[in-house]
From Swiss-Prot:
GO BP terms in the entry: 7-methylguanosine mRNA capping
Protein name (database record): mRNA-capping enzyme subunit beta
Annotated segments matching region Disordered: 1-149
Lineage: Eukaryota, Fungi, Dikarya, Basidiomycota, Agaricomycotina
Organism of origin: Cryptococcus neoformans var. neoformans serotype D (strain JEC21 / ATCC MYA-565) (Filobasidiella neoformans)
The family this protein is said to belong to: Belongs to the fungal TPase family.
Amino acid sequence: MSTYIPIHDRPPHYANLPSPPSNSRQPRPPRYSSPDIDPDIPLARMSSAHESDPSEQANATQSGDYVPRQRVGSQGAEQEGQSRKRARTSPSHSGGNGSYVPRQRTEESHHSHHNGHSGHAQSDQHGNGQVYRPRHGQAPLTGSIFNLSPRNPFTSVVGDFIMNAAMGHSNVEIELKLGTFMTPSMPGQQPRRINMPTLSEMIIPHDYPNGPFVSTINHLHHRTLNELLNRAVESQSTHPTGRLYFSRSKLADSFYDHSEHGHGKVRVSRDMDNGHVVQAVEKRRIADLNVYCPGMAYDFRISVNTETPCEVPTGNAKSVRYKDRACYRHQVCRVDLTSVFSSNPRNADVPPSRSFELEIEVLDVPALLAEGAAQSERFDEILQNVLDSARMLVKNI
C-alpha cells in the first residue's frame, strides 16, 4: 500500500512527462509583442544557444516553418533598412505633451487642395494600392431611412415662438437684430459677453439669468457689411429671381413716452430733407427670443412687436434719433444697415452719441402667419431664409 502524500506536497502533474530531446529541430513558436512595441522587433528568445546557431535557422527556413527576423544592434538595423512603421514623435517634437503631429502633405495633395478638390479623393490610397475617385451618377439620398426629412428643430422652435407670440395681435412686426448678450453685472463691474456651454448656435431659455442685450455693432463691422451687401447688389443685378434691391433713407425718429392709451412708446418718423411726417406708430414689444452664437462676433435677438398707427402727439419728444439707413430688400426680408445719431432734447447735459445697427425685418408678416396657421412647408422656408441671411452676415464679419 502506497504512502499517502498531502496534496500540497505532491509534485505537479506534468513532472513525470518526458522532456523533449535537447537536439530538437523544431523552432520555438513566435512570440508576439504588445501593440506598444514595434512588431518588427521580436522579443528575445529564452534560449540564446538556439538563436546563435545559424544552421538550425537555415534548416527551419527550408522546412517551411516561420522564423522571425533577428536584428543584432545597429548593424542589423542598417541591413534590414528603415522600419515600415512611422516613427513615433517624441515629446520634444510634439510641443512637449506627446500630441499628434500631422503628416506633411505631398506635392500632389497640396496641388489638389488648391484646385478645390479634396486631397483624399485625389491622393489617398487604399491598402490594395487603388486610388479613390468619387463616383458619378449616384442616386440622390431620400432624407432618412423612412424617406422623410424631419423638421429642423431650430426652425421649429423659432416658428412656434412666433405663432404663440403673435396670436391675438394685429399690426405685427417681426425683426431680427444683431448684438451681444452680456452677463449680469454689479455696479462698478465691467460687463462682458456671456459664455454658454455650447459649440453651435443656441436658443437661450427665457428664464436664463443673462444681462442686457447690446443691439449695436462695431463701426468697422458696419463698413464691412455695407461693402459686402453693395457687392451683392452689383453681382445680382442681372438675376431674374432672387435679386437684392438697394434703397436709402434719412429719417429723424422722435420718441414720446406713451400714447393716449398708455400701452407703449410712440415713434414719429420725419423725412430729414423736407421735415414731412412719414410715419407715426405706437410700438409695443410682445416677446423676444435670444440666440447665442459662440465663436461669432455677434448674437441675435428675434422680436415680435406691434406697430399700431396713431396720431402725432403734442409736446416735446423724449429723445430723437437721426438715422442714415441703407436698405437691402430681398424676397422675404429686408436688411437695414443704420448709422444712428442720438440726442436728448430734454437734457442738454447728456452728450449726443453715435451707434451702428443691423436688423432684418420680415416683409409680409400676415402672409407668414397665414402659412404658419396652415402648417405649410412654406412657413419653414421663409423662416429658414431669414435665419440663413442673419447667419451669412455674421459669418462674413
